[in-house]
Amino acid sequence: MALPTIAIVGRPNVGKSTLFNRIAGERISIVEDVEGVTRDRIYATGEWLNRKFSLIDTGGIDDVDAPFMEQIKHQAEIAMDEADVIVFVVSGKEGVTDADEYVSRILYKTNKPVILVVNKVDNPEMRNDIYDFYSLGLGDPYPVSSVHGIGTGDVLDAIIENLPAQEAEENPDIIKFSLIGRPNVGKSSLINAILGEERVIASPVAGTTRDAIDTHFTDPEGQEFTMIDTAGMRKSGKVYENTEKYSVMRAMRAIERSDVILMVINAEEGIREYDKRIAGFAHEAGKGMIIVVNKWDTLEKDNHTMKQWEDDIRDQFQYLSYAPIIFVSALTKQRLHKLPEMIKAISESQNTRIPSAVLNDVIMDAIAINPTPTDKGKRLKIFYATQVATKPPTFVVFVNEEELMHFSYMRFLENQIRKAFVFEGTPIHLIARKRK
């Protein structure tokens, strides 16, 4: 089920990112200190009054080299295209500016809810100055101090009031997957080839989300799939649409709704920073992953080429050691028949549940191989572990002191669990918790 999207827009230096961090709070988390996992905070999940939503700081997407007004226009266009609710941030210290008026004229035409936030209202006396912002024609201004957290609750209330009705839960038996990657890596050709390979009638499912084109199909064994594609990857006519920074947001929307991600790399161009950035988002979201090297037919190859590629991918995507790699050609259909089976296998791994007794046998065996660490004379004690979730498989390890569970030992336990059970293509999460 797609989460509704909130876009934060506004000219530079009005405090968009501060408001973003204040709303997102601790939900922005970097779970691993691994090189290559993105530290970009333009996208997060927020929650208020039991409603979850996606939050986008459009300033983080912007092209800093573009002319000033072009940047602002770009932000507003993204907001118009993507958001269910737009949060327009202005500065109470500077008052209404020409740039604010420029953005307001664009937003006024969107026919989408716009919440006008006057930020940097850091003392009560400044509240008297917010009335000038009524001139923007966007309704009541909300005075806020993002730095001090004053007024953000009122903004969140307004966001929730303007969100669309919640969608019905999707069928959990249907495997949802998407192809993501840089523009021109061959996603569209792969999509068409996969659908053709299945020899089924594929039908677009309209209205599932505002901007997605979902294609539903069934394989010969009766497994149902939903392939999530975005309108932005297919439609034309917008100058910014094919820029990598715009496609980042499209990819993140697809990642959010998918169970399994097919990360497509162009064999002709190799691995780029964009690939690592998007893969990091999918990894942190706990999604299943297949690394698909497309256009494999275009390369001059010898007996070592595939191994060299695999080594390079493992080196540059160290945090994706669990993800299988497949070399394909959408043009010649090389190895495409393997993809649906790989997706099914990963979905099965994502939904695996390990009985507590079996899991704890593995944990005890791991401790026998590599005793728990000590810190300042105090040894980590592991009492027991249990699985608390699937998609991704998540385990809580109950210990005497959480601080004694070093990252390296947590990684060791994860590796031992992976050796004992089949978790192909899916991350697994381990959480240390003090036993009460």
UniProtKB/Swiss-Prot annotation:
**Record-annotated residues binding GTP 1?**
10-17, 57-61, 119-122
**GO MF terms held by the record:** GTP binding; ribosome binding
Which InterPro entries is this protein grouped with? Answer: G_ENGA, GTP-bd, GTPase_Der, KH_dom-like, KH_dom-like_a/b, P-loop_NTPase, Small_GTP-bd
User: What family does this chain come from, according to its entry?
Assistant: Belongs to the TRAFAC class TrmE-Era-EngA-EngB-Septin-like GTPase superfamily. EngA (Der) GTPase family.
State the function annotated in the UniProt record: GTPase that plays an essential role in the late steps of ribosome biogenesis.
Gene that encodes the chain: der
**Self-association state and partner proteins as the record states:** Associates with the 50S ribosomal subunit.
Q: Which UniProt keywords apply?
A: GTP-binding, Nucleotide-binding, Repeat, Ribosome biogenesis
Name of the protein in its database record: GTPase Der
One short Pfam family name for this protein?
A: KH_dom-like
Tell me where in this chain the KH-like domain is found: 352-436
Q: Is this entry keyworded Repeat?
A: yes
Please report the stretch or stretches of sequence annotated as the EngA-type G domain: 4-167, 175-351
Q: Where does GTP 2 bind?
A: 181-188, 229-233, 294-297
**Organism the protein comes from:** Streptococcus suis (strain 05ZYH33)
Which GO terms of type biological process are on file? Answer: ribosome biogenesis
